[in-house]
Amino acid sequence: QNSYWECQELLEDILDSYQRDFPKYSERDADLKYVQLVFARTPHIVGQPFKFVAISRDIQSKYIRRGIELCHQAGVIHPVYSSHGFPLEAKFNPDRYKLLFADLGLMQRACGLNISRWISEDYRVIHQGTIAEQFVGQQILCNHYGFKSGKLYYWERQKRGSQAELDFVIDGQDAPIPI
């Protein structure tokens, strides 16, 4: 039990360390505010198609976009772009994406998710899709499976009455490979 709480404290220290480092990635004081906001909100929206209002309803999208760019440069978030064809890079939509957080452990800590409760059926049902998507995306990024551009992709169909999504697709030799 002690090691669990020590681990949670360590994760909290890492999150705090990121916050202290953000001024290094912010060219202006105004940027710092947006970087901090994006960093704080991203763990709560992992795996969801990104909407600027998920970060803030009161801040213009151009400022949030700048915060996303800076967080991505800092390596604390990673966009997963929608792509509708092959090759993925040629058919992706730079304005349609989801976000991954830096790390699954950090994500659960930032969200206040208690790992020891994951064995509870109700708790798992609520969070398992997000947790799985973060884990798989993180593994793809760590191992550089099937991508050269540094971009991750997903596929979705948004037709009325016929919605579908593949959380990740990578370039294969002759066709995209769903993950």
Model-inferred region functions:
Residues 3-175:
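Accessory nucleic acid-recognition modules appended to NTPase machines
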Residues 179:
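Conserved beta3 VAIK motif of the Hanks protein kinase fold
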